[in-house]
From Swiss-Prot:
An annotated GO BP: aerobic respiration
Co-factor binding details: Binds 2 [4Fe-4S] clusters per subunit.
E.C. numbers: 7.1.1.-
Domain 4Fe-4S ferredoxin-type: 74-103, 113-142
Compartments reported by the entry: Cell inner membrane
Protein name, entry field: NADH-quinone oxidoreductase subunit I
UniProt binding sites for [4Fe-4S] cluster 2: C93, C122, C125, C128
Catalytic activity: a quinone + NADH + 5 H(+)(in) = a quinol + NAD(+) + 4 H(+)(out)
UniProt subunit comment: NDH-1 is composed of 14 different subunits. Subunits NuoA, H, J, K, L, M, N constitute the membrane sector of the complex.
InterPro entries with a match to the protein in the record: 4Fe4S_Fe-S-bd, 4Fe4S_Fe_S_CS, NADH_quinone_OxRdtase_chainI
Cofactor list: [4Fe-4S] cluster
PROSITE patterns (UniProt xref): 4FE4S_FER_1, 4FE4S_FER_2
Length: 213
């Protein structure tokens, strides 16, 4: 048999109507209530101190790493798709909303035929962008994607960067992309120091040749 313990032995349950009214007044009229009213009136009477904006006429500027609707990136130099069809984004998706269909081309390399995301089911956790080895899928800043239907699918042509807009594609854009200082966080290998020594010797030889002339 379970043992039950009283949390507050001094607390008495109100019986009469007056006891119930007095208990309600004691709980509602406290110092914290007046503190909240004071803060509200102080912010209300301040000039040019609006805590809201007139949406959709005004919009808040979002950070580049904000997780909104996905984007599929291209290589700027070759205009090819970055996606290699490894399927890691589909496997790691905890909402099970990513579907990918791949096939082999004439060179025996895998290519993505169909790619779809159920945006109505996606929770925008960013796992797909974090796990992508080629930085092919990132999160953009397009957040106005409300729809009337529950299942709202986006397809490959919706996410992929158009070739005519490729010049506007920024490398470090969207959640999942590398940071601008990513190279500073990579551990140096022995080959790195060998290359730096060779460059230093080349610069030294160039300076000596310039002085001899």
């Amino acid at each position: 048999m379970k043992n039950y313990y009283l949390v507050d032995e001094k607390r008495k349950t109100p019986v009469s109507t007056w006891e119930k009214i007095s208990q309600a007044l004691r709980r509602s009229v406290k110092l914290e209530l007046f503190v909240g009213l004071f803060v509200m009136m102080r912010e209300l009477l301040k000039r040019n101190n609006s805590a809201t904006i007139k949406y959709p006429f005004e919009k808040v500027k979002l950070d580049n790493r904000y997780r909104a609707v996905h984007r599929l990136m291209r290589f700027i130099e070759s205009e090819n798709e970055r996606c290699i069809g490894c399927g890691l984004c589909e496997k790691i998706c905890i909402s099970n909303c990513i579907r990918m269909e791949t096939s082999l081309d004439e060179n025996g390399r895998k290519k993505v035929e169909n790619y779809s995301i159920n945006l109505g089911r996606c929770i925008y956790c960013g796992f797909c962008a974090e796990v992508c080895p080629e930085l092919a899928i990132v999160h953009g800043t397009e957040y106005e994607n409300a729809a009337e239907q529950r299942s709202y699918f986006g397809y490959k042509q919706d996410f992929l960067t158009p070739i005519d807009k490729l010049k506007n594609q920024v490398e470090f854009e969207g959640a999942g992309s590398l940071r601008k200082d990513a190279n500073l966080w990579v551990k140096k290998t022995p080959n790195y120091y060998d290359v730096m020594i060779e460059r230093a010797l080349e610069n030294q030889n160039t300076q000596e040749q310039g002085e001899n002339k």
